Design a protein with these regions (language model features):
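A C-terminal junction/extension of Radical SAM enzymes
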Residues: 221-251
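Short glycine-enriched, charge-decorated loop/helix-capping segments at active-site entrances
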Residues: 68-75, 159-166, 231-234
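Radical SAM/AdoMet-radical enzyme domain recognition
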Residues: 81-98, 106-220
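Conserved alpha-helical substructure of the radical SAM core
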Residues: 2-136, 141
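A generic "alpha-helical surface" signal
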Residues: 79, 169, 237-240
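A short, flexible beta-alpha/helix-coil linker loop
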Residues: 68-72, 153-156, 223-226
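A short, mixed-charge helix-start or loop-turn motif at secondary-structure junctions
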Residues: 51, 66-67, 156-160, 186, ...
């Protein structure tokens, strides 16, 4: 599986983007883990990777999201992000996960990526704000992998994500912009009762591969957020089945 994925990455993406990924995420990421382990031996703790919520605003109202998007907008400005990333780089970090709300609602998110070409960023996004122009900029930077959340078909997406309609199609449009510009792009899904049978299928992964997606994440719906719904949570048996499925698909 890993050989096939490596072959796809080399043949289907921009070679400069592959090099950025291998250097900033692969080699330097491995180094950051090594330095983290050395710190632990000295009873010092600083994680090898940071996941940062840069804004609480979002255009959707997804069930299971821990962010209350109805609150007043809060965001981390560029100077603060530069300081945070700079301090992390001082101890050897180079990989950062960027979360929201919806990260691309941060008006200066592209400046953050541009200011740190020696780092690699994974952005958790619904894809609605990734236009052709934005995707073109991400390709120019070469240090970003968009991870686009798709929660089910058109009906399930609209019901679960609280948008005005067309949630699925807008996410797919953002996904296509990323793939057209040969970005190393992934898709993530929060598994719950309304999408479990549809999304936890090899046919869904085959569709993503056919589209040009390079990796997929599944995570489990948690009963959290402003309007938690316990009826959406997976049973222990379903969680175990999901884990088995992921392990089998990796083989």
């Amino acid at each position: 599986m890993y050989f096939r994925m490596a072959k796809r990455v080399i043949s289907e993406t921009d070679k400069r983007l592959v090099w950025k990924f291998l250097w900033n995420m692969g080699i330097k990421g491995t180094r950051s883990v090594y330095k983290h382990r050395q710190r632990l031996k000295r009873d010092e703790f600083f994680p090898p990777f940071l996941y940062i919520s840069i804004i609480n605003s979002c255009n959707l109202r997804c069930q299971g999201c821990w962010v209350d998007v109805a609150e007043k907008q809060h965001k981390i400005d560029v100077p603060a992000m530069d300081r945070l990333i700079g301090q992390a780089k001082e101890v050897g970090n180079s990989f950062f996960g960027i979360l929201g709300g919806e990260p691309f609602m941060h008006s200066e998110i592209l400046d953050i990526f541009a200011n740190h070409p020696d780092c690699y960023f994974q952005v958790f996004t619904n894809g609605h704000f990734i236009s052709d122009e934005v995707a073109r900029e991400l390709r120019r930077f070469g240090n970003v992998t968009p991870l686009i959340s798709i929660e089910g078909n058109e009906i399930v997406s609209d019901e679960r994500r609280g948008g005005p309609g067309g949630v699925y199609s807008q996410s797919m449009e953002g996904l296509h912009h990323c793939l057209e510009h040969k970005l190393l792009t992934g898709v993530c899904t929060s598994l719950c009762q309304t999408n479990y049978d549809d999304m936890l299928q090899e046919s869904w992964l085959d569709k993503l591969i056919d589209l040009g997606v390079f990796y997929a994440w599944f995570h489990i719906y948690r009963v959290i957020g402003p309007e938690p719904n316990g009826q959406l949570a997976l049973t222990p048996e379903q969680q175990l089945e999901a884990r088995r499925f992921v392990v089998e698909m990796r083989a």
